[in-house]
Amino acid sequence: MTTDTASNGNGAQQAPSLNILAQYVKDLSFENPGAPRSLQARDQAPSININVNVNANPLAENDFDVVLSLNAQAQDGDKVLFNVELAYGGVFRVSGFPQEHMLPLLFIECPRLLFPFARQIVADATRNGGFPPLMIDPIDFAQMFAQRMAEEKVRAQVANSNTTTN
């Protein structure tokens, strides 16, 4: 006796899938404003500030453009040593998932898949700029998503309280 669990059309539900159709550099900028002085050895490590953002936009019914933006700046005191900005995108096909799973997929799973490639591009850019490669620590996209949802909830509550008091 066999059990047929595969979808064969005729109304059978398709298994959920997440596919990367394309990956691309949307924007890359490296600035070394103090070169060549900025390349000299220093007594202490520079301070590094990193900002991360994720955006997702629909392209078609099941296709989405997800862009992971990484901005990193190294400073020695008040002097900027380098500034690197990367917008790294991926086109994802998402099908068979319940609607309530779409935002977490687009803002957690998709950037998690893009991150290793974006990290390598940033490391190569800083190395090619004359600095040691900047190896960005892994990012907790689930925590970022939770924070973003909490901020949007607060904004919505403030907007609702402003409309009810006017």
From Swiss-Prot:
BP GO annotations: protein folding; protein tetramerization; protein transport
GO molecular function, one term: unfolded protein binding
GO cellular component terms given for this protein: cytoplasm
Compartments (UniProt record): Cytoplasm
Highest taxon, organism lineage: Bacteria
Principal location class: cytoplasm
Annotated keywords: Chaperone, Cytoplasm, Protein transport, Translocation, Transport
Family: Belongs to the SecB family.
Quaternary structure and interacting proteins, as annotated: Homotetramer, a dimer of dimers. One homotetramer interacts with 1 SecA dimer.
Reported function: One of the proteins required for the normal export of preproteins out of the cell cytoplasm. It is a molecular chaperone that binds to a subset of precursor proteins, maintaining them in a translocation-competent state. It also specifically binds to its receptor SecA.
Protein name per its UniProtKB record: Protein-export protein SecB
